[in-house]
Curated annotation (Swiss-Prot):
Organism (species): Rattus norvegicus
Name used for this protein in its record: Early growth response protein 3
SMART domains attached to this UniProt entry: ZnF_C2H2
Transmembrane segments: none
Gene that this polypeptide is encoded by: Egr3
Basic residues bias locations: 350-360
Length: 387
């Protein structure tokens, strides 16, 4: 097996001059490797090593500097000192005692000191680093938050997909004893209920519902159509079930301007208009319930349709549609005579009357000369003679 460079190793000169014994590495090296397992003579063989003369030697093709000079004699190191080796050895061919082909030489005693228990170990990483003091590590990297159990990290069932088409293995959350905290009820406030129009005098008996905190309350629009239950409550004087057991006083409807022609007969027969207005003094009847709902907004003042541009409210959806055209500039109605465009159909109809009047005037002016050009019969004067 051949060695590759993993790191530069600080080695003393004496270790290069004194050859290691041949039986130091047997053919099958056990897992617990001891570099100095010889007799006392072999240990004394290294007592003359000088620990001060150290140089970096790599296992590559780099040649050392030939100009360096070395002394012929080596003085023994004062005291009982040790030399520490730090590095790794990588091998091309794998062996049964080193599966990862990497040997990490952490430390080895030289002068009769027994090596540490972790002197020689195999690691799966490709580089070794000297660990800094524990205080510096804690200062640079704060400690991670402790976890009581695995359920804090994995609270949902984990499933693994098999590419061969087998069904995934699902692990139930019973293995991870954890319970999710319940959602705070204050996190999502209740949305206001617009199922029924409330009179200003009755707002005190209804619990207050606040919209979302980040949303403007004026932009929360009620539904466009008043529910049919509200109309029946007006008509039959019944208590709406949404109010519970609290009695609701009858809703007073605001009077409206009287009709210009109150006794004008309607084209639709009376029996085909079963929906009558419940307001006092109003004799309006309608054939459809939605027409009555739209009419009741006149009495209640309810304007559920709101423009999101200028925040103006309307009681009818078609009024909102024509109002939005003032912001967009859309004019879909064009005059048939002059091509002028209008945003509302009634404006075009009013404008068309101008052309009709002009046409009538032209026809009148064209008919007057034809009447004057008719031939007139002139009678001859009667001549009388006197005798």
């Amino acid at each position: 097996m051949t060695g590759k460079l993993a790191e530069k190793l600080p080695v003393t000169m004496s270790s290069l001059l004194n050859q290691l014994p041949d039986n130091l590495y047997p053919e099958e090296i056990p897992s617990a490797l001891n570099l100095f397992s010889g007799s006392s003579d072999s240990v004394a063989h290294y007592t003359q090593m000088a620990t001060e003369n150290v140089m970096d030697i790599g296992l590559t093709n780099e040649k050392p500097n030939p100009e360096l000079s070395y002394s012929g004699s080596f003085q023994p190191a004062p005291g009982n000192k040790t030399v520490t080796y730090l590095g790794k050895f990588a091998f091309d061919s794998p062996s049964n005692w080193c599966q990862d082909n990497i040997i990490s030489l952490m430390s080895a005693g030289i002068l009769g000191v027994p090596p540490a228990s972790g002197a020689l170990s195999t690691q799966t990483t490709t580089a070794s680093m000297v660990q800094p003091p524990q205080g510096d590590v804690e200062a640079m990297y704060p400690a991670l938050p402790p976890y009581s159990n695995c359920g804090d990290l994995y609270s949902e069932p984990v499933s693994f997909h098999d590419p061969q088409g087998n069904p995934g293995l699902a692990y139930s959350p019973q293995d991870y004893q954890s319970a999710k905290p319940a959602l705070d009820s204050n996190l999502f406030p209740m949305i206001p209920d617009y199922n029924l129009y409330h009179h200003p005098n009755d707002m005190g008996s209804i619990p207050e519902h606040k919209p979302f905190q980040g949303m403007d309350p004026i932009r929360v629009n009620p539904p466009p159509i008043t529910p049919l239950e509200t109309i029946k409550a007006f008509k039959d004087k019944q208590i709406h079930p949404g109010f519970g057991s609290l009695p609701q006083p009858p809703l007073t409807l605001k009077p409206i301007r009287p009709r210009k022609y109150p006794n004008r007969p309607s084209k639709t027969p009376l029996h085909e208009r079963p929906h009558a207005c419940p307001a006092e003094g109003c004799d309006r009847r309608f054939s459809r319930s939605d027409e009555l709902t739209r009419h009741l907004r006149i009495h209640t003042g309810h304007k559920p349709f709101q423009c999101r541009i200028c925040m103006r409210s309307f009681s009818r959806s078609d009024h909102l549609t024509t109002h939005i055209r003032t912001h967009t500039g859309e004019k879909p109605f064009a005059c048939e005579f002059c091509g002028r465009k209008f945003a509302r159909s009634d404006e075009r109809k009013r404008h068309a009357k101008i052309h009709l009047k002009q046409k009538e005037k032209k026809s009148e002016k064209g008919g007057a000369p034809s009447a004057s050009s008719a031939p007139t019969v002139s009678l001859a004067p009667v001549v009388t003679t006197c005798a």
